[in-house]
């Protein structure tokens, strides 16, 4: 790797029903499994669970009769867990969860009362909004919350505009792949690393998870369809945020930059005993960015435009620690006939 890299900002595309054109993550309940029925390979069925939930399964082979999905892994593959759609005439128990889907809205609500019937989900004394459905959690712009399903996530996205960057944050898996329909672009990145400093650690330390990764060389075709896949073999695949957008170069990232975290945890002392209330933390990054002579006004305009705006930054594709979603902090752009170095602070969101 060289000593410098382009410093880019990415303006994330707004994700809508029209943009997310298909997904392997189930969202609504399906036909219930019946022990007396015979299923073909690819058939989808559900098994009811607690709190108005349903586990969704896919049949792995034909002539599939009387094999209970929950304990027949050679016959059924679990796709995920969903919750029943809210119905005003249904009586819900305390802690039951319902799904409410509207135009570009995919939300879950938890019942706050027993015998909960006929109360709209907008009644905050009866219902608590708990967030997006599992399929749409990766688009809620909250890095800590994850879409989680067994083995694999596949999202098909039709941007309808020029995009050249796909960024995955807080991802858990063995690999991530991005493919584009028009250009034939397809790239897979391994998400497990073994960064060690000596032979002892090489043999005895576990592989570590790469949690943040970007694909910054996607050919920008307006009519291209993107397929984003996270694979994790026989374990859960998870993704905190998926951002797709078009990057813009501000300048050149100079080395070295520094990164740390802002911790939101608190400590409490009771009778001399200190306990921690663990909360989320977020990246805090500081960069020196070389601005080409003559480009200062444009760099200033761009940084002003995206101040107090949520963006993705890519200071380098080689260091995951620099990849972040959040907002610009303090920055300044000096002017010089020979080019100058801008100081840019970035604060990530959780």
Q: Where in this protein do the model-derived segments appear?
A:
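Extracellular/virion structural assembly segments
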Residues: 1-24, 131-152, 156-350
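Tryptophan-rich substrate-binding surfaces of secreted polymer-degrading and adhesive proteins
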Residues: 1-144
